[in-house]
């Protein structure tokens, strides 16, 4: 059927080619001829969500409102047909929608509805674990905030039991104000079999791509330097690193999001990187005032400090996969412009083969490998690949 072929083409554009705008136009064409096509309604909403979080021109309330309206129409259509599986799918997409805009309580209600309707997906355990983590963080913050604003009653002078007729003068209450922290510079990264993507989270962003200088040494193909002038202060932002493996100096792409830079590098080979950097040369934003000669040592982060900021490789525990280790802290989530950009890039909306490849490779390798290539993974058991200098133990 022509419509089925068009749906496959649009789905491929959205998830395989990573072109949500192209997919949006394709779904629009399908809906012109079939306004109640459930699949087109659901995934047109997904296109709008990806455009909202990935492109500044689409980052508006209207975009997300349109996505929600499409899901509303899809739900009405599915309920009208009595299609239980499609109703479950729409509820799952509602969950993703509200999760991404950080309404975790509402997201949880739709997640439960989807499960109760029998919706099945390989990523459900991962989403459930992620949702639980977010809710726990939110509840903890609310509890801490409540405790912080609790005022203890002051005991009156009459009730102190002090019989002295004279009292020492009462000193003015000194209120110590906690120093405000300077904006943090954080790093996140993930990889596929062909590329490595680095996210630099900072509030000091350039005005355009043209202002960013990205240099990869053609000699060792591992020395990376990223710099640009900060518009507001006139100071310079710099990130320098010695990558753990070689990349193509000529194949570099850059995207600027509301609170981060995203740099994608092409691998020379398909080696799975165990870490981003071999050693740390300089990892600092160098946001000192003009004319101020600060000690160069203050602009260097030690390997120990930087390692705390970077993300750990997923745990190999067979009982539970702690996917929260793949994420930076809550503040970085806020800066990313999405509820969970890193998790979203890896799992949200992946095609069925990619999902199967990721689940199979991670579980069979005991958490030491993560592949998106189903054609490769399906050929046999994925072997355990421990980090360099370590060996697997069989208990």
Swiss-Prot record:
- Superkingdom in the source lineage: Eukaryota
Q: What is the lineage of its organism?
A: Eukaryota, Fungi, Dikarya, Ascomycota, Saccharomycotina
Which CDD domains does the annotation name? Answer: p23_CS_SGT1_like (cd06466)
- Name-wise, this protein is Protein SGT1
A single Gene Ontology CC annotation of this entry is: ubiquitin ligase complex
The species this protein was found in? Saccharomyces cerevisiae (strain ATCC 204508 / S288c)
Q: Where is the chain membrane-spanning?
A: none
Coiled-coil annotation reads none
Annotated region Disordered: the residues are 137-175, 373-395
Provide the cross-link position: Glycyl lysine isopeptide (Lys-Gly) (interchain with G-Cter in ubiquitin).
32
- Family that this chain belongs to: Belongs to the SGT1 family.
**Cited function:** Involved in ubiquitination and subsequent proteasomal degradation of target proteins. Required for both entry into S phase and kinetochore function. Also involved in cyclic AMP (cAMP) pathway, possibly by participating in the assembly or the conformational activation of specific multiprotein complexes.
Share any extra remarks: Present with 1340 molecules/cell in log phase SD medium.
